[in-house]
A protein has these predicted regions:
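Nucleic-acid substrate recognition interfaces
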Residues: 1-209
C-alpha cells in the first residue's frame, strides 16, 4: 500500500541554492518540451512528440542534465499527463474550450524517484544524488562542493520503503516535501492516528494519502 506524507525540512543556504536551481531547471525543461508540443509541425518534426520521444530527444540538453535523470524524465512525464488531460477534456467536452498546458513562469517542484534516494532503515536522514553537471556548475559558479543532499526529519524513521520524494522550491530556509512510501499491510494504520483518502497527487499513479 502506498501512502504520502507532507512535511518540511530546514535547509542550509547551500542546499537552498542547489534545490532552487533544480526547480528552475525543471521549469525550463517543462517549457522547452511544452514549446515543442505546441509547435512540433513548425519545428519540422514528423510526428507529435510524446513522452517517449521527449525523454530521449532532450537527454543531452542543458536543463535536462541539471537534473537527476529520473527526475528529468518525471518532469517530461508530468507534462505528458497534462497534455493527455487536455485532449480528454477537449474530446469529452468536460470543460468548454479547455486550455492546453501553460508555460511555467516560476520554479516548479522536482520529484526524486527511488533510485536517487538512499535511506537506511530507522534513520531520520535521506541522501539524495546530484547530477554531475549540476555539481560542476555549483562548484564553478558558487564554490559549493556538495556531493549529495542530506535531508533530515524524524518522520523518515518509520518509512522503510520510500518510493518518491517531491521537493518544492525553498523559501526562508525551509523546503516543503511530499514523501511517497510503501507499507506492507493495514495493521500499522491503527496505531498512527492517520486517515486515508484517494489523491491522484503529484505522482504518476493513484495512491493513498495519509493525513495527520
Amino acid at each position: 500500500m502506498l501512502l504520502s506524507h507532507r512535511t518540511s525540512v530546514k535547509i542550509r543556504p547551500e542546499y537552498s541554492n542547489i534545490i532552487g536551481h533544480m526547480c528552475y531547471a525543471a521549469s525550463k525543461l517543462w517549457n522547452v518540451c511544452n514549446y515543442e508540443r505546441h509547435h512540433y509541425k513548425e519545428l519540422g518534426l514528423e510526428k507529435y512528440p510524446d513522452w517517449y520521444y521527449q525523454k530521449k530527444a532532450h537527454k543531452g540538453d542543458l536543463w535536462y542534465r541539471q537534473l537527476p535523470s529520473q527526475t528529468a524524465q518525471e518532469t517530461c512525464k508530468q507534462l505528458d499527463k497534462a497534455w493527455k488531460s487536455f485532449y480528454v477534456l477537449k474530446k469529452t467536452g468536460g470543460i468548454k474550450e479547455p486550455n492546453p498546458p501553460r508555460f511555467k513562469q516560476d520554479n516548479i517542484p522536482v520529484t526524486y524517484m527511488q533510485m536517487g534516494i538512499r535511506h537506511e532503515k530507522g534513520s531520520d536522514q535521506l541522501r539524495l544524488s546530484l547530477p554531475r553537471d549540476l555539481k560542476s556548475y555549483m562548484e564553478e559558479t558558487y564554490g559549493i562542493h556538495e556531493r549529495f543532499l542530506y535531508l533530515e526529519n524524524k518522520i523518515f524513521r518509520d518509512m522503510d520503503h520510500i518510493k518518491q520524494l517531491r521537493i518544492y522550491p525553498p523559501e526562508n530556509g525551509k523546503c516543503d516535501l511530499i514523501v511517497i512510501y510503501e507499507i506492507e499491510g493495514t495493521e500499522q494504520l491503527s496505531q498512527n492516528g492517520h486517515y486515508l483518502s484517494i489523491d491522484p497527487g503529484p505522482v504518476s499513479y493513484t495512491h493513498l494519502r495519509a493525513h495527520e
